[in-house]
């Protein structure tokens, strides 16, 4: 389940796109075409030190000869964004995965409403380019705290479809420049909402949409970062490895991944925050305590899979298909 297809690419260009944000243009080594992708796709990037991180593709999905990603340098980086900014340079060869898409455009739709906060513009920009090429009806709203921190702002304003895009800069008032209530009410049948950005931005958009009675099937979103949630009432529980019968106790301070590693069972991870889905594992028996932002509510309710990087157990034991 966790194995991926990888390929080698060359960093053709690295440039600053905004304050604290750089982009990488990735080309195939042999000059041939790259695996096709659709708007909303992301790739895993293998970084120095054994780190693996996910970055969305921002270029037009009809471009078969390159991938473009943009990376925000996070002040609280666990090594990923710092490695991109400090260690990767034009001319280097790196390993990436083939593209995957958990944030695809819904078709057919009467209209597409695209909302991006900060670095969340990367998959949203690819969507806008795709929709514009198809002459589809869409609006793009791009929110940021300061103009100099908004990647691709100039490119958006210079695009042939710039009339469908609005930039909302918060710096003047200190409050959000976008009136979410006015934008999302009333809900319109056939309109699909796509949102990507920091968790606070995502929560504000989705909470407003749900309060306005947007149907879940018209809401599409992708988180860029989460937090492994530890609660004061977390208790120990057991995890059994189905293939070997090994049992390990997971303490309140540990994640399931960490506990499994202590007995020599390695689960492939990437974000380690319940966002990317890399560590998705089948649950044979027991009831998970889902704390991820990857599975849908319906998938969580089924209790037949979970993300061991962040989720825990409500039952005394989980038996995992490992």
Regions found by a protein language model. Give the residues of each.
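Ferredoxin-reductase
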Residues: 2-93, 110, 144-146
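A short, compositionally biased
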Residues: 38-41, 230-237, 275-277
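Short, surface-exposed secondary-structure boundary micro-motifs
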Residues: 48, 99-100, 284
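FNR/FR-type flavoprotein reductase catalytic core
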Residues: 82-243, 249
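C-terminal accessory/binding modules appended to enzymatic or scaffolding proteins
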Residues: 235-268
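Iron-sulfur (Fe-S) cluster-binding segments and ferredoxin-like electron-carrier domains
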Residues: 259-263, 268, 277-322
């Amino acid at each position: 389940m966790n194995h991926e297809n990888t390929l080698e690419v060359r960093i053709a260009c690295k440039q600053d796109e905004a304050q604290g944000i750089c982009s990488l243009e990735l080309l195939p080594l042999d000059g041939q075409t790259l695996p096709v992708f659709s708007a909303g796709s992301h790739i895993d990037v293998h970084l120095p030190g054994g780190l693996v991180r996910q970055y969305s593709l921002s270029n037009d999905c009809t471009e078969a000869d390159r991938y473009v990603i943009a990376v925000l340098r996070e002040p609280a980086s666990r090594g990923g964004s710092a490695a991109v900014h400090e260690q990767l340079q034009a001319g280097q060869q790196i390993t990436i995965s083939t593209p995957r898409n958990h944030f695809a455009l819904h078709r057919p739709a009467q209209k597409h409403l695209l909302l991006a906060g900060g670095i969340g513009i990367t998959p949203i920009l690819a969507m806008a380019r795709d929709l514009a090429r198809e002459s589809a009806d869409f609006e793009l709203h791009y929110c940021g705290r300061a103009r100099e921190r908004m990647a691709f702002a100039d490119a958006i304003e210079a695009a042939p479809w710039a009339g469908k895009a609005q930039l909302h800069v918060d710096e003047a008032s200190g409050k959000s420049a976008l009136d979410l209530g006015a934008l999302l009410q009333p809900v319109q049948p056939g309109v699909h909402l796509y949102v990507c950005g920091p968790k606070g931005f995502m929560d504000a958009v989705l909470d407003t949409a749900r309060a306005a009675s947007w149907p879940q099937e018209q809401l599409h979103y992708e988180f860029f970062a989460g937090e492994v949630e530890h609660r004061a009432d977390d208790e120990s529980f057991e995890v059994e490895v189905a293939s070997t019968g090994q049992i390990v106790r997971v303490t309140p301070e540990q994640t399931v991944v960490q506990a499994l590693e202590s007995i020599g069972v390695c689960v492939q991870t990437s974000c380690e925050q319940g966002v990317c889905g890399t560590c998705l594992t089948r649950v044979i028996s027991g009831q998970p305590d889902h704390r991820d932002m990857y599975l849908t509510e319906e998938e969580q309710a089924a209790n037949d899979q979970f993300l061991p990087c962040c989720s825990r157990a409500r039952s005394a034991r989980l038996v995992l298909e490992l």
